[in-house]
């Protein structure tokens, strides 16, 4: 079989962190996401209250794999035409899974008009609006330096 990535598990008495690293040049069909979720479940305590799955951007198979068997999805939308379109599609997909939906807008201040459209759509569609995150160039600097944004 074609191995597209490596599973990694970090665990202590209180937390489990399951992730994977995709090998360069390989695509992710969603099977790797499913394996990451399975590894997390297999290594979590039975009394674990919740787990966070940080899904990939867009609306492809990995995102659909992230949505299976979850109670709630937090959609992080960006106020651009493509971001709005992706948001609409992921909302439709999440509704097919009958999961609760919450939404926030990342970089809300780069396009006030689309941000307002997103808020109005949330109200109209009865989606819990979680808030707005401003654009901050220091976030990009932190990513480029491989440092947490909180430092």
Language-model-derived ranges and their functions:
Residues 53, 75, 103-105:
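Structural beta-sheet core signal
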Residues 1-12:
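Cys/His-rich short segments
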Residues 93-151:
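C-terminal lobe/tail of nucleotide-utilizing enzymes
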Residues 85-95:
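Amphipathic helical hotspot of TIR/SEFIR-family domains
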Residues 29-30, 63-64, 87-88, 115-116:
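Conserved strand-to-helix beginnings and helix N-cap segments that scaffold or border functional pockets
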Residues 60-81, 87:
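Inter-motif core of Ras-like GTPase G domains
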Residues 19-28, 35-63:
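Switch II (G3) loop of P-loop NTPases
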